[in-house]
Amino acid sequence: MFEHISPTQAAVEFFYGLLMAMTLSNTLRLALLGSSPADVVFIVSVAIFGCNTAWGIADGAVSLLTSHFQNMYYYRKVKQIKEGADLEAAKELAAEVLSEALTELQEDVLDAETRRHMAELTVRSIKRQEISEPVVGRSQWMTALWCLVMNVAAALPFIAIYQLGLFLGLNLVTLIANVAGAVLLFFLGRFLDRRLGDGNGRTGVVMVGLGMLMLVIIVALGG
């Protein structure tokens, strides 16, 4: 899985999917007051599945296009370096490309000597290599597919919980769905902790707080 989509991107997709499902379950429950439990269960379930699927498709398409455009951006930069006759200009461009990602967190993470050395090695390597124009490949399609999968996966627990509305009060079912959402948010934060952090659990608590705050804001603004 993570050879195609990063843990962070997977977590973000699942987070958005949870927010979408929780928002729909709360807003539609209010909008359908007075409807029969069977109607509420059906409408909420279809809406959550449909909206999360649509969001997953849209986000997957955006991910695919963004990845391709980013690859094209770097391809043009590398092509400029390869075809450039001015060696110093090529080194400056190489240093710019190499340091873009590394200096995102801290501008001075690379000193001048390191930049110069990296640029020289990069220019030499690029001059020797054949540069192929990037195309949309299998990995990018798989990333787009995982965006869809993560959004749909986030919807399934809420669809399952709302089936209880045929047997339990709908207010209780909505409460159970919200509690389940908070639990999923916590474990999503724990997942990020294990993958990217120090595993102290704070990210889980932060994720619950952030998710619930955003849910309240979204519902208050009309969903």
Residue ranges with predicted function:
Residues 32, 63, 67-75, 163, ...:
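Transmembrane helix-loop junctions in multipass membrane proteins, especially transporters and channels
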Residues 45-79:
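Hydrophobic alpha-helical membrane-embedded segments
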